């Protein structure tokens, strides 16, 4: 008998045992997590728009509750966490303004939540009254500091960290929120958003002095910051994040989302530890499921799991569903009022509108310009021809397969913020800066990527940030036949844009600082609904308003091919 063969089964059993059975003295924790749910209380279509075919719909709090309860019954040590941005995104938030978030998160018995930037969309009062005072779970952020009269008003309503008993152990949860929130939302002047890493370290140190040796950083700053926290903050064992809608998955993904990496994503900290980092995409489509094994000293021994797709194979809990239906009565007028029809898919997904021209962006910009038609001078066909719109302001697609019907509820999911479309005057040089800002960190799914109307722009992403706009043409107004001319740096142009951008949102500080005139306009949803009602049937296309130069597209692929070729040559000649 071959000795090597005899040893193989024993070796295999030992390896399997290491995976399937915890090490002696080890303690297991199951972390269930959501992020960026954005008011998707009801089940949605696969693209997170309004549910059309119930047999193919996903998510929703009733289905989430079913899965959470199944796991709680099967496993002993379970935490349910949310990494922020429950607020904003559908007619639910428009009507209930956050009360629905507190009610249904309480019903699901969340253990903790981190504050996201959108929790401040209705100001601090819109956070305090409906959510902070009503939540039966701790709401966390270590890097938000209140000052002035607000400090006493909000004291104790949110915390930097919380120690939670889980089985016979304790787990520390420390929260964080994007320091860019003042540029993304409306927190006011009495909240200071500190650097996440600088603010987190002393709070983690406090937890260590309390003999808490299992610490989760729960927050809303995006995947890049999540990874930095895992690397830089000493004592953090796990990072549960949000904000960037990052989809991580190990193996073949169950739906159309493309993984940005394996789940969990492992970061090696500066002190040599392996720190798992997770997110669960967005819109309640998935429930993050992470198993962590700790040793007696609180060190992570192993971590594994995957997001669970909440598809129709998971039944909706009847009691939660009944509660949803009861709350929904108040929304019915919004869902039955037909504005018009679309005969094409209106792509308002973040995967499109934050990366390239999307036809939803074209529709909205066309509506904005149409709303400003003023033929007052024979020299001008119109007083304004240009629109810019941050892709992050487009929050949902609309499916044409529901008879193409567009309702107020559909539009409220696309434009949930209740802003206005304003008219400003800018120099060409300011517009050029704005378009450079649009792609200065392209590829990170950030909201500043601009959708346009009356503008043709070409980017070269192989060039350094700040020098990526290679062509920028604008539609003339002083002309009888509109055509595109190169942007002139010293000329003053009229542009229609969201008031969010006029006020410097999404980092467009150059617009706020350099605008020459600012006139407030009509509410965004009214502008688009009026346009759709006027047109009756719409079919916006992708028209080449935004292009990327050949070098931009080929740059990364060419480098990869070049390196691969050299690798082959190296191997052949060894």
Curated annotation (Swiss-Prot):
Pfam family, one: Metallophos
Keyword Secreted: no
GO cellular component, one term: extracellular exosome
Residues binding Zn(2+) 2, per UniProt: 36, 85, 117, 220, 243
Glycosylation, residue list: 53, 311, 333, 403
Record-marked site positions (Transition state stabilizer): 118, 121
Catalytic activity, as annotated: a ribonucleoside 5'-phosphate + H2O = a ribonucleoside + phosphate; a 2'-deoxyribonucleoside 5'-phosphate + H2O = a 2'-deoxyribonucleoside + phosphate; dTMP + H2O = thymidine + phosphate; CMP + H2O = cytidine + phosphate
S-S bonds: 51-57, 353-358, 365-387, 476-479
Keyword Phosphoprotein (UniProt): no
Keywords on record: Cell membrane, Disease variant, Disulfide bond, Glycoprotein, GPI-anchor, Hydrolase, Lipoprotein, Membrane, Metal-binding, Nucleotide-binding, Signal, Zinc
Activity regulation information from UniProt: Inhibited by adenosine 5'-(alpha,beta-methylene)-diphosphate (AMPCP).
Family statement drawn from the similarity comment of this UniProt entry: Belongs to the 5'-nucleotidase family.
UniProt name for this protein: 5'-nucleotidase
Organism encoding this protein: Homo sapiens (Human)
Recorded name of the encoding gene: NT5E
